[in-house]
């Protein structure tokens, strides 16, 4: 076990912390035992008592000694270890109904896993867990992650399961794997996500579904005929919709409202979008993604990328969301529907050292949040604005204490709305309960290798892409800290701090 210990992170029901010893400000900001990481390693009182009992009973009987040793081993799981990011892999992201038109979720995630297995020599190894998910799934995607594992050279004994939290799926998968590693339940695992809108499931009307189920259980010809008579042509017209069930509005329509509320200009959105494309194009030219991407189906880079993008060119596009002259959101400053997959290899420090792998960074804190976008009319994609300050408070950090900011660019206006909220005294006081604004960030540290506006956004795959990118950035710098923020459907937000 690692020497690094802390109080049980489950004490805060809304957040978790995988311990890191690199955030020096935390010790001075610590208010209660459950708010942040202790400055020095500390043994759990339960574990210490167990060790004492084990010694005192050793002279009495071998049976009690064995029992105490076993209990000591079990109690060692209360020791929280640092969680290392070893590396990541993804396939190039592709615009919907294009290069990956004939690829399924399983095809894409299997290819991503195979690339990760090859890069880190995981052939034949039994990992502790593989956790991944997809937002859009067919019924044939039952047990998808496990089936993908069985398609790879990982040992068949590697367990796997699916999860889903909309656009936060990939990062949330990393949290689950990290928790198991931190608690000593596993040594190594993979977290990831995949999505395709090219191969989206098409649902029929509920009337047709019920008629077909009735037809399936019918025992006589008369019963079958009765079931068939219940089929109505209108039940064949229920096309897939990209909207919130509670409001009927799409993400773009929701964000158009938020952009208007925060006064986000068209020019600022286009500038952010153009910058994302330009920075990602430069990153490709520099070879930054060479060890983060596995070519797939003829692509070796994201085909949404527009290296020649400029704010002037984007300004010529017509608005796609919003109404009238106030509409500012276009196809150019919004992410397109995208297909792709990503995965990240996480491990304990001990496993990394034993297997000869360099640690890129450590996951130290993470937080999830949700807003009431139905009754309180909060912005659908503004939950990260709430998650980040809670996470900063536990970490004993300020918004300015970061070398990199990796903020998911679902829409340029979403990023800008969030940043503006953190600078706004009224929002920070009335919504966040803070005495003063969080303040502004150094924009030169924002999405320095480009982000979703350039790469695209396969919903569940975005978290893995961002986590792997941030970890590599920190490792290249040698030391540092990155803030990760991802908004998600349903009024949710998933955020993390990684450092080295």
Give residue ranges: language-model regions.
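Intrinsically disordered, polybasic Lys/Arg-rich low-complexity tracts
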Residues: 1-73
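Condensing-enzyme catalytic core mediating Claisen C-C bond formation in acyl metabolism
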Residues: 72-103, 227-234, 240, 315-386, ...
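N-terminal extracellular/periplasmic Venus flytrap/periplasmic-binding protein-like
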Residues: 90-91, 101-111, 119, 231, ...
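Active-site pocket-shaping loop/turn-to-helix segments
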Residues: 91-114, 118, 137, 161-175, ...
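Conserved beta-ketoacyl condensing-enzyme motif
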Residues: 101-189, 193-216, 287, 293-303, ...
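Conserved catalytic cysteine-centered active-site region
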Residues: 134-189, 232, 246-250, 308-336, ...
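Active-site-proximal alpha-helical scaffold in enzymes
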Residues: 165-195, 203, 259-288, 343-351, ...
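Flexible glycine-/small-residue-enriched beta->alpha junction loops
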Residues: 188-257
